[in-house]
Amino acid sequence: MYIDRILLKNFRNYKDETIKFSKNLNIIYGQNAQGKTNIIEAVFLCASGRSHRTSKDTELVNIDGTGFSVLLDLESSEGRKKIEIDYECGKKKVVKINEIPLKKIGNLMGNLLAVIFSPEDILIIKEGPSERRRFIDITLCQLKPSYFYDLQQYNKVLSQRNMLLKEIQYKRNLLDTLEVWDYKMAELSSRIMTTRSEFIKRLCEISKKIHLKLTDGSEIMEIKYSPSVDLHDLSNPSEIKNEFIRQLNSIRDIELKRCVTLIGPHRDDYEMELNGLNLKMFGSQGQQRTSLLSLKLAEIEIIKSETDEDPVLLLDDVMSELDFKRREFLLENIRNVQTFITCTDKELFENRNFGDNLYIRVEAGRTYY
C-alpha cells in the first residue's frame, strides 16, 4: 500500500497544493511552523476520518477559507482508490471513496492503513488511561470496522445511561428502565473487551520480541490488560456479558448516588512494564521512548499480518527524539513501508538509500522538490 499524491485546498496553511510522494522514504523538511505536520495530519485524516491533533474540524480550515478539501490517491492490493474529505463550516464532513459518498464514517476505516508516531505519543505512557485506550482503539478501528461500530454504539449507550442515572434522582419510576440499558451496555462491552484483550495479548508478544532486540536482551517488556470489570476469562463474550451485568447490579446504589456509570470499556486501561517495573512510574525518558518505538513497530507488524498490506508510516518530528542506535534500528525495520518523516534537518538521512528517497522542502504552506 502506498500513497501517490495528496491535494490540499484551504487545509491549515495550505491554500491549493498538490504533493506527490515516493513509494519509499519521504523526507519532509523545513523550519518550524511552515506546515510539515499539516501534511502528516491530512494523511491521517484520510485514514481515520479525524485529525490526530484536534477533534474540531473548524481548526483544520485555512484562516481565509470557509471549508477545506483533501484528496488522496492511493494504490493497494485492491487497486487504485481516491479518498476525498470535504468540509464546510457549519456542515458535516463529506467522505468519498472513488467519488462515491460514504453513508457512515466507519466505511472509511481500513481503506488507508496508517501508523503514526509523534512526540505526543509519550502521553500513552505518561498520562492517564484515555490516551492508552485511544492508541489501541485507533489501530483496532482500522483493522476491524465492526469494532468501530461497537465503540460508536457503546458511547451512545453510555451517554444515555448516564443521563438516565441523573433523571432517576427525581423520577424514581424510571428505575426499572435502567435494566434495558444495562443489557445493551453488557452486549457491546463484551465484544469490545474481548477484542481489546486479544489485541493487547498480540501486541505484547510482538513488542516484547522487538524490545529485546532493541535493548540487546536487557529489558523484558510486558503489556497487561486491566479492564474495569473484574474478569477471569476474557476470551468468552457470553461470560463477560453475564459477569458485567452481575457487577452492574452489585454497584447499582453507588452509581445512583454518583449519577455516572462506573464500569465498562470507557474505564479500561493497560499497564506497561519493563523487567517487572511499571514503565510510567519507574521508566527513564529513554526507556519510555524506546518502549514506544517497540509498540509502533509491533503495530506495523500486526496490521501487515492481519491485512497482507504494509501500512504507511507517519513519523512526525520523532527522529530527533531517538538516539543513533534506535534511529538506525527503526530505519532498518521500515524498508518495505512507505514512510513520511518530518524534520528540520534533512542531513540525518542523506546517507541513507532506500531506493527512492524523496526530499520535500516545506515553506509557508508551499512544497518544493
Swiss-Prot record:
Any idea where this protein resides?
Answer: Cytoplasm
- Keyword Ion transport listed: no
GO BP annotation list = DNA replication; DNA synthesis involved in DNA repair; double-strand break repair; SOS response
Annotated ATP binding sites: G30, Q31, N32, A33, Q34, G35, K36, T37
Spell out the coiled coil positions from the record.
Answer: none
Q: Which domain of life is it from?
A: Bacteria
Q: Which UniProt keywords apply?
A: ATP-binding, Cytoplasm, DNA damage, DNA repair, DNA replication, DNA-binding, Nucleotide-binding, SOS response
Which family is this sequence assigned to? Belongs to the RecF family.
Q: Which NCBIfam families match?
A: recf
Task: Please give the name of this protein.
Answer: DNA replication and repair protein RecF
Can you name the source organism? Acetivibrio thermocellus (strain ATCC 27405 / DSM 1237 / JCM 9322 / NBRC 103400 / NCIMB 10682 / NRRL B-4536 / VPI 7372)
